[in-house]
């Protein structure tokens, strides 16, 4: 049964990633991978919120599997982040690559912290 929850969440997260990535990237005339950056930050805040809610006892394991492992796992993408960073480096956009690495890690951490903090304010 657990794997079905993960699959169901992934069936929502994967198309959301694709559609969000395309929508965001189409609005930026830049080599910087704004779409991937956006989905990773959104996923970090959602996972932070879910984790904070779980720590407060407001969410059960089924919802964590559905939204945390399934939805957030499919929404976020470390492999695309890595590939796009490599491509930036290979095409000479080394500054963009460095900003992508530093900015993605920093923004992801801030987003996760914000999600946990929001959950703490809502459920603690």
Swiss-Prot record:
Question: What are the binding positions for Na(+) in this chain?
Answer: 73, 76
Leader sequence segment: none
Keyword Metal-binding appears in the UniProt entry: yes
Give the UniProt subcellular location, in the record's own words: Cell membrane
InterPro entries for the chain: FluC
- Keywords of the record: Cell membrane, Ion channel, Ion transport, Membrane, Metal-binding, Sodium, Transmembrane, Transmembrane helix, Transport
Bilayer-crossing residues are: 39-59, 63-82, 98-118
Q: Membrane topology per the record?
A: Multi-pass membrane protein
Q: Give the Gene Ontology MF terms in alphabetical order.
A: fluoride channel activity; fluoride transmembrane transporter activity; metal ion binding
| Gene Ontology BP annotations | cellular detoxification of fluoride; fluoride transmembrane transport
Matches recorded under PANTHER family: FLUORIDE EXPORT PROTEIN 1-RELATED
Q: What is the recorded function of this protein according to its Swiss-Prot or TrEMBL entry? A: Fluoride-specific ion channel. Important for reducing fluoride concentration in the cell, thus reducing its toxicity.
Q: Name the family the entry cites.
A: Belongs to the fluoride channel Fluc/FEX (TC 1.A.43) family.
Q: What is this protein called?
A: Fluoride-specific ion channel FluC 2
Taxonomic lineage is:
Bacteria, Bacillati, Actinomycetota, Actinomycetes, Kitasatosporales
């Amino acid at each position: 049964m657990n794997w079905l929850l993960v699959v169901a969440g992934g069936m929502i997260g994967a198309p959301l990633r694709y559609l969000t990535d395309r929508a965001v990237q189409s609005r930026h005339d830049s080599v910087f991978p704004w779409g991937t950056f956006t989905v990773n930050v959104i996923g970090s805040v959602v996972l932070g919120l879910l984790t904070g809610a779980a720590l407060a006892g407001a969410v059960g394991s089924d919802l964590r599997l559905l939204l945390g492992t399934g939805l957030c796992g499919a929404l976020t993408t470390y492999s695309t982040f890595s590939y796009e960073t490599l491509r930036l480096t290979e095409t000479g956009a080394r500054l963009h690559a460095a900003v992508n690495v530093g900015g993605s890690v920093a923004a992801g951490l801030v987003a996760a912290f914000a999600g946990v903090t929001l959950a703490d304010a809502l459920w603690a």
